[in-house]
A protein has these predicted regions:
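N-terminal accessory/capping or targeting/presequence segment of soluble
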Residues: 2-102, 112, 147, 154
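Flexible, acidic/His-enriched mid-domain "rim/lid" segments that flank
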Residues: 89-197
Length: 200
């Protein structure tokens, strides 16, 4: 990321910004407690934690995420258009939120998308990166988090053991595995594990 300086602490008058999928970004999941396979916008602005979500996900985010506010991407998009932006994109939407807060300094993770970073810098924003652990609190696990991790491990072990039982029951015919009259594919095994976890 060009022209960005690494800092280990957040300047007081800066925003934190993620554009990522929480399904693959553990820092973003930690911040929101919301699982999504597609990238979304997350901001920390003057002590307030915000998510900007598409119309498809906005209601689910409002019900499940542990943030202060969930904003509608399409509403911000319409607002940008009303201000003369012909075809608003992700950065135009972020710009509105940061403009409202009067902030120009942004703290981002090292994985922040380069093209988005370049666009923000072109608009006059100063970006700083911070290495992991982005949230120091993540290093310390609470008793509740430890219990959740242990429960997840037990569920996975039980589900995998159940899948092994299915494999032992399977028959080989013409070099193909069959179970209960159907071909036992790797996708079917994964599905059996997933179902097993859901019932633990």
């Amino acid at each position: 990321m060009s022209h960005s300086t690494e800092h280990n602490s957040r300047p007081e008058q800066s925003a934190t910004l993620f554009i990522a999928a929480s399904e693959t970004d553990s820092n973003l999941y930690y911040a929101t407690r919301f699982i999504a396979p597609d990238p979304f916008i997350y901001l920390e602005v003057k002590g307030e934690r915000l998510m900007v979500m598409s119309d498809l996900e906005v209601d689910r985010a409002r019900n499940q995420a542990t943030v202060d506010r969930v904003l509608s991407y399409s509403e911000l998009e319409r607002r940008a258009k009303s201000q003369g932006v012909k075809d608003p994109g992700t950065i135009d939407v972020i710009h509105l939120v940061l403009q409202d807060a009067g902030l120009k300094d942004i703290l981002v993770p090292p994985t922040f998308p380069f093209l988005h970073a370049s666009r923000l810098q072109e608009m006059g924003y100063r970006l700083r990166t911070k290495r992991d652990p982005f949230y120091e609190q993540r290093v310390m696990k609470s008793d509740e988090e430890v219990r959740h991790i242990e429960a997840a491990q037990r569920a996975t072990e039980t589900a995998v053991a159940a899948a092994h039982q299915h494999l032992r029951r399977a028959e080989i015919r013409d070099n193909v595995l069959w179970l209960d009259g159907e071909i036992l594919t790797s996708e079917r095994v994964k599905k059996l594990i997933k179902i097993g976890r859901a019932h633990v």
